[in-house]
Amino acid sequence: MSSALPPFRPSLVSDPLSARQDPSLPGILPVSAPILIEDIGPRVSDGRYPIKRVLGEGVVVSAAVFRDGHVPLAAALLWRRSPRPGEPAGGRGAWHEVPLTQIEPGLARWRARFDPPAIGRFDYLIEAWSDDWAGWRHDTLIKRDAGLDLSLEVLEGMALIEATIARIDGTDQAADQGLLSSWLADAQGLETAGGRATLMLSETLDAVMARHPDRSGAVRSGPPLSVVVDPPRAGFAAWYEMAPRSQASEPGRWGTFADCAARLPDIRAMGFDTLYLMPIHPIGRIHRKGPNNSLKAGPDDPGSPYAIGAAEGGHTAIHPELGTLDEFRALVAQAGEMGMDVALDIAIQCAPDHPWVSEHPEWFEFRPDGTIKYAENPPKKYQDIVNLAFWGPHRQELWLALLEVFTFWAEQGVRVFRVDNPHTKPVPFWEWLIATVKARYPDCIFLAEAFTRPPMMKMLAKIGFTQSYSYFTWRTTKAELTSYMEELVEDDPADYMRVNFFANTPDILPFHLQTGGRPAFMQRLVLAATLSSVYGIHNGFELCENAAIPGKEEYADSEKYDFKPRDWNAEGNIKDLIAKVNWIRNENPALQAFRTLRFFRADNDQILFYGKMTGDRANIILVAVNLDPHAGQGGLLWLPLAEMGLSDGQPFIVEELLSGTRLEWTGSPHHYWFDPATNPAAIFRITP
């Protein structure tokens, strides 16, 4: 194991114009170009962190570009692949260029778009310059139309053409050089200034001159900004979480990887594309937890899979009851053949009998009496877990060992990692680790399971986590859902934080699922799957399991501490609804995006009405959900006709995709009724 951490140097970005001092002027007078480039977007924390996109999603960049006076400007968006760690600067290739278009002249706003061609990290910046030829042509046209003498203007224009001829370089541009020389000679052969001006003001000449601007005085916006381009499933996916040991078809034995593989067709039939496994490693025996988190475990109690490590191995080992490494690889391969990724749960914590405790005691914290310090979140105590000393004197060796955990599983074919409680580990550690892993495996996806304060959740997203857990689990009212979603899609997080909406987790059985019965499960499924483009459920959700420890948001007899074999086709399941909702998501591109979410008016506080549409309006989806699982609700739905490109009297086709109903509506509003037991939600596809 190397004793030094691989280098990681985050890019600090700001965009003031660089100034140089002219020694002939007083020291307080900087000499700089007259062009200013301000308010570049998108950017995160003034460019300190990259924005995020998925492959196939373009990056629209805008800025204010202006200068003193009335000289016309031109600008371009420059982009290229970012250098990889250890790669020389020249290895990333030349800048690609896209012209900027002025979209709001009164505000000096310019905009352009580029489409990164691959997964990875890309840099971008703006370059602007004064367009002297456009300025000359604009002023000369006005003077000609006013009947003014153009003698001096002609001389100025000729000088600009001569400078362009001299500036053109390269055999591929020789044709333009010849054209300009011919035009110049023809103009010089004319006797009158008016005749020369007419020739020089031709649109054909203007097009040639525009191809060769004088950019010697061009200004760049400063150090480049960056975008991380992730695989499409970083932005659109449906996760199914399972406890592998609970997948046995009969009670009383451990589930195996073979049992997990046997369930793949059923999971895929429900429309899930990411199979998320709770930790699969050996489980500690010291202070092992019993059922319902009890402190006493019986001889046959399996313990918590989050108490990682025992005599059989640690974070790169597999619990022997689950199977072998070859059988795990076979599960990953079989899932891949069915169009599914396998996500692995990585919990950076150790059982007291994890091999690292005896092999590397310097990686842990000990109390004054010599006992190892176990994990606490007062008043909660986790006697079966000990934490690592991330800032201890041996942190380099520890950090490298943890890096090897992720790269080991990546080598087994895993490209998706759900990280347990990352907010309890140092942010610099995650920034370094994720960047290092993605330098080797750029298609890796990291999900941050961090239910914590918003600044920490946002920071984890900024420094590299691909997806984030969210507060959706606890947002239940119309006001709460609307406010929270608008914060995510319209405010600062939109460019860097992708939320994965889990309707439940092994740890969390929300009160609304405990009390709302089957209608609550149907309601929350539709909300999670249509509000966000990435969502998930923990196994048992499809069976509407809601037995809880009284007064707590915790499952009774949780499979975190026990086996839980099930009849996966038990009466009352909502598997058909899940399959239908996932089919709708896959068939409608509007639902595969997140930042296009908008809320619309519904005249009932128990009805949430919202929608998404593609930029070209080719796919328009509106969703209405009854938030009351106990009673039917109805109300007027006010459709956004203008946003959909419809006039008030124009008829349009409405398909309610959950029921298959097809309607013809005209105008807005329209009344709709929701029965929590039979139609707790409606998903409308609008066709003008």
UniProtKB/Swiss-Prot annotation:
EC no. given is 2.4.99.16
Can you say what this protein is called? Alpha-1,4-glucan:maltose-1-phosphate maltosyltransferase
**Parts forming coiled coils:** none
| Family listed | Belongs to the glycosyl hydrolase 13 family. GlgE subfamily.
**InterPro entries from the xrefs?**
GlgE (IPR026585), GLGE_C (IPR049171), GlgE_dom_N/S (IPR021828), Glyco_hydro_13_cat_dom (IPR006047), Glyco_hydro_b (IPR013780), Glycoside_hydrolase_SF (IPR017853), Ig-like_fold (IPR013783)
Q: Which SUPFAM superfamilies match?
A: (Trans)glycosidases
Annotated Gene Ontology MF terms?
hexosyltransferase activity; hydrolase activity, hydrolyzing O-glycosyl compounds
Q: Which GO terms describe its biological process?
A: alpha-glucan biosynthetic process
Complexes and interactors = Homodimer.
Kindly list the organism's lineage: Bacteria, Pseudomonadati, Pseudomonadota, Alphaproteobacteria, Rhodospirillales
Catalytic residues in the record: 420, 449
